[in-house]
Amino acid sequence: MESLWKLSYLLEPASLALILTAVSVAYASASRALDHGREMERNLDFSEASITLDRSQALMIPLASSCSLLLMFYLFSSVSHLVTAFTAVASAMALFFCLSPYVNCVRSRLGVGDPFVSRCCSKPFTRLQGLLVAICVGTVVAWLVSGHWLLNNLLGISICIAFVSHVRLPNIKICALLLVCLFVYDVFWVFFSERFFGANVMVSVATQKASNPVHTVANKLSLPGLQLITKKLELPVKLVFPRSLMGGLAPGSSPGDYMMLGLGDMAIPGMLLALVLSFDHRKIKDMSVSQDMPPSKQRKYVWYALTGYGVGLVTALAAGILSQSPQPALLYLVPSTLGPVMYMSWLRNELWELWEGSRPIINDKAHLLEV
């Protein structure tokens, strides 16, 4: 009975905010990936084309991630300034990518002119884009100075959406391979790394803070306002929500405690959602072209995957609460998202079509490798 009572912690404001944000970001990532692909096809502009993973790349991702994890575990204090600087640049670029469609939409609806100013990286650069760059850079600077968790989450969400939009899966075959490999990766580094390295590598890396290069420079130059600049930063590679959010605080928790979810636990399922959302829209388009085929009223695959993601995320949080120990989220998210999609496609006799995927658009800019 006590265990069931502990599950009420899932109704804390921090837990609910984490769940709702993660589900929304996973769907937003898939939707933005679909729109980005359409935009590239419509404009025949592949200078920002996506990378479509092949089998060898899917196998290399867990290995590369493991190497990065060990590097951060042993050498983080030595490279934290460099990592923070790289993350700041990537965050600004990702935020620009995410906000650009909204700026263009507002401009077109208001009929506001946006005169050409110059060329940047062989692309036209307008005044509104310049203003947006300033806003994005200002947001990153505000994060570097304050380290506020809301800004951290905003930048992390932007990175997640940009990643899913630019790194694609060609079919369920490669998707299943990637998810199973990352399933093993997550389980090993959370549950078994302590036996080999003397500490839980995943938890250690996820919870350590980076040194703030802005604070270091301000300190060396004895600049005024040094006390306003945070010394340590949570990098935007995870969502963080304070347990004291809106007055909620679980027994045994301190006001400084946070609930965390790694970006990979949103981005990897988001790649699956992007794949099935693209498949859903292609099926609808094929049916609209075919005159003798009635429009399908079947539920889209993306909703099965998204529902499974929500269920898997709640299950992962519940397991963490009941066990009082960190849980590998992909242990729950991989079967809860991939399973329903494969089962429903098998029932509809579309598993082979999803398994092999549609032929991608070949261009000299995109990195497309056929399996």
UniProtKB/Swiss-Prot annotation:
It comes from the Eukaryota. Residues 1-6, 76-80, 147-149, 193-258, 323-326 are lumenal. The active site is at residues 186, 265. Residues 28-57, 104-123, 168-171, 280-301, 348-371 are cytoplasmic. InterPro entries: Peptidase_A22B_SPP (IPR007369), Preselin/SPP (IPR006639). The chain crosses the membrane at residues 7-27, 58-75, 81-103, 124-146, 150-167, 172-192, 259-279, 302-322, 327-347. Its main location: membrane. GO terms for cellular component: cytoplasmic side of endoplasmic reticulum membrane; endosome membrane; Golgi-associated vesicle membrane; lumenal side of endoplasmic reticulum membrane. Keywords: Endosome, Hydrolase, Membrane, Protease, Transmembrane, Transmembrane helix. It is a multi-pass membrane protein. GO terms for biological process: membrane protein proteolysis; signal peptide processing. A motif (PAL) lies at residues 328-330. It holds the Pfam family Peptidase_A22B. It is found in: Endosome membrane. SMART domains: PSN. Its EC number is 3.4.23.-. One of its GO terms (molecular function) is aspartic endopeptidase activity, intramembrane cleaving. Intramembrane-cleaving aspartic protease (I-CLiP) that cleaves type II membrane signal peptides in the hydrophobic plane of the membrane. The first transmembrane domain may act as a type I signal anchor. The PAL motif is required for normal active site conformation. This is Signal peptide peptidase-like 1. It comes from Oryza sativa subsp. japonica (Rice). The gene is SPPL1.
